[in-house]
Amino acid sequence: MKSFTTSFTTGLKSLLRRIEMKRRKFIISAASTIPAITLFPSDLSGITRETVRGKLEKRSLGKTGEMLSVIGFGGIVVMNATPDDASARVRMAIDAGVNYFDVAPSYGDAEIKLGPALEPFRKDIFLACKTTERTKEGSRRELEQSLKNMRTEHFDLYQHHAVTTLEDVDTLLGPGGAMETFLEARKEGKIRFIGFSAHSVEAAMALMERFEFDTILFPFNYATWNAGNFGPQVMARAKEKNMGILALKAMAKGPWPDGADRSAFPKCWYEPLITEEDITMGLRFTLSHPVTAAIPPGDEKLFKQALSLAHNLKPLDQKEVNSIREKALKGVPLFKS
């Protein structure tokens, strides 16, 4: 557990350094001309919603025709769990109405634990996976291994994982790049939809300009949005293209302060929101935008809180929007544009 956590945290810190070190002016007119999405009270235009008493709300996923639960299950929740615990956590999520599960090879043993636990429910859920491999050969190898680990013949969504720089974009979309695997696998029936996750505005905007993706997985968070101007331009473009919008970091407070005790949340490389009031605020902010689903942190306790609180979310009114903005401006956002 300790060695993986150290490696996981180190890798994410490295990713953030790359964003800062390689950030450069991004000359795509859309990035500078698309305005931020107006802050509601509620901006869910274009989203179809389904509600069933006692279950999580479901929302439409862009142009895919799929309906996903507003809370997704991140594979890190079962990382290092026993098989019995993994099955229990999956069952808990299913019983709450979760039908969206997301995993990646970089999440330690999560695939190996999640695959058997999900097998009885496979036909009823939407399964997403990702690869950090940028080449055709590497991504094909990782795709086939992930399918084997997850005990499935196909993924509903396969994503380019953590795309950070324009060099990443050029490589994965270029000759011999990972996109060649994605397109071949879609023809083979091994993946249904193609998406990406990103942690930089420039990479996200570049990808959306150069390929017709089905989905985007991106940090849409009250603090990064208001204090970092990180997210509005990406969401506006994704909505314009009728992409399925999936959210990371809805429950992030910001970077861990220097010297902070992180022992209570070893799977969180950022400081999470932990009180019921703050978690509710974070989820309400993110899900009041045209977001289909939010993936909570991989910590089991926080995931359970998200499941509980997401059943009773109400739209934000303008007074609350203003209050959240003031709160965000007092803190340090996890990402900045």
Kindly give the residue locations of the regions a language model identified.
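N-terminal binding-site loop/beta-alpha segment at the start of enzyme catalytic domains
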Residues: 12-125, 187
